[in-house]
UniProtKB/Swiss-Prot annotation:
Protein name: Aspartate carbamoyltransferase catalytic subunit
The keyword Membrane is assigned to this record: no
Subunit structure: Heterododecamer (2C3:3R2) of six catalytic PyrB chains organized as two trimers (C3), and six regulatory PyrI chains organized as three dimers (R2).
Keyword rRNA-binding listed: no
Enzyme Commission code: 2.1.3.2
Disulfide bonds: none
GO molecular function: amino acid binding; aspartate carbamoyltransferase activity
Gene: pyrB
Classification via Gene3D superfamilies: Aspartate/ornithine carbamoyltransferase
Catalysis performed (reactions): carbamoyl phosphate + L-aspartate = N-carbamoyl-L-aspartate + phosphate + H(+)
Pathway: Pyrimidine metabolism; UMP biosynthesis via de novo pathway; (S)-dihydroorotate from bicarbonate: step 2/3
Amino acid sequence: MPNPLYRQHIISISDLSREQLEYLLQTALKLKAHPRGDLLEGKLIGSCFFEPSTRTRLSFETAVQRLGGKVIGFSDGANTSAKKGETLADTARIISGYTDAIVQRHPKDGAARVAAEFSRVPVINAGDGTNQHPSQTLLDLVTIYETQGRLDKLKIAMAGDLKYGRTVHSLCQALKRWGCEFAFVSPPSLAMPDYITEELEEADCRYRALGSLEEAAEWADILYMTRVQRERFDEQEFAKIQGKFNLEASMLARAKPNLRVLHPLPRTDEIHPDVDAAPHAYYFEQATNGVYARMAILSLVLNEEV
């Protein structure tokens, strides 16, 4: 099969077909099993992070270097010409003249698509506001497949901040292609947005609301925890919702043996440290898979054959 992602922007999961996602998934698994250090030889990647990041930025940069490429960029938009008023369109024009691809994180929804419109090289969205995070979704798919042996017809529970959490939005849009069933556990003020539940209905995917993490752990194959993102609230609002849904090891007592607890990280208090030793905990392995998922994205975008 010809590489369907060569020279393509990776902006939103909704832009990708099931076949493209499977191609990415299988490439990530192949690179994990048999690493290659030559796929980005002679390539220069622009790492443009206008918003703080640890795992995403470092795993992308690790992926580039493991593939034989080099990285230039910044980790704080305050230290760029954006602070002087330069538009995102102009920034994309300039950096695309220096590099072979751009990896961008930005606090504004839709920023990745703006950059892609004006860039001369592929743009990979590393998170744009509350909107999309496609590379996180790919590493989630790799992890789910790795732990469950399939993606079809799984029961996926999502808990915490489902309104602003771009990771759960992207993951729903991906897993609906495999006919998964969903359960949501969140305060009403942080419920899954209507546009996501409408997409699930259109795909004939069932979903429900559950009242507790114990229920979710007993029902699900995957329990996907999320952090309430303090940076998206004022202090008064944050105090009202903080700690509403925190997972402890005792809540996993009736979980199925195959249940795995995932989290995009960083966590605060929504997963108690006593969960780390549970056989269901898999979020640190999930983070490691970020390197292989991002190796797959970069390799396929910049090579006709991998």
